[in-house]
Amino acid sequence: MTLHDLLLSGHPTTSRIVLPMLVEEYHVGQLWSVAQASKNETGGGEGVEVLVNEPFDETHHVPMPKLQAAGKEFTVGQYTHKVYHLSSKVPGFVRLLAPKGSLEIHEMAWNAYPYCRTIITNPDYMKDNLYIIIESYHAPDNGCTPNIHGLQGRDLSARQVVKIDIANDKVAAKDYKPEWDPCLVASPKAGRNPLPRDKTGEWMNHAKPVMCCYKLVKVWFKWFGLQKRMESFILNVEQRLFLNFHRQVVCWLDNYYDMTMDDIRRLEAEVKEELDRQRTEGQVRGTVATDKDEEQ
């Protein structure tokens, strides 16, 4: 199966993540938070390596097929290519089967905000047998747009929709920190209070400002005897990462509230050097695969 075939097929899962912020704020906040989260996940021989971070257009780092969402086409933005050096961040049964050095995941992203396509592969070991495609669109609504990615036919009928509530969804005990809890953390700079812990998600109907991250995820994993198990594991991990990351984005708002995109590009250059040092030092940090990711 080619990448183009996968983009047009598969069994998609759509996550809708409502946030109490402006779409413009999230543009800066997402990038700031990715840089911070990369530092939190890097150490002890594992973590993030940034290979490329530069603009793309219709002649350089051209995405194929074209970037399209919400009835629009996107032709310019920022291209990144990262390598994730993993071991403890994958399930135990994969570590037993995979040879040393095979647990390196490549992530290529075309960020044409408010749209972004991310492609995750394992070219050295799985080759064309692993693709994770994430297509993200960021809209100024509360998750009410029914089909923002323009799915049709079988894709639309087979789609699973997951609404992630950053205030009330259960967070794994090992992931929880009070400073990453949007029900406890306010933003004095933006003048925003903590979110209510109402169990119903009613806050999403009243939040001002409000926006939604619409994430369409497709997984292709071809490994005899493990396909369904690994595809399920990957989707569970993605939901866990979406929940944790977006709670952090909201709680970190004061850190990036006054920043510009020029500030972000300078920060990314500094973080790249820090990651290169940090990856070879200390202990493994951040998210570690758990048995529950396999069971859910």
What function would you assign to each model-found segment?
Residues 2-296:
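Eukaryotic helix-grip
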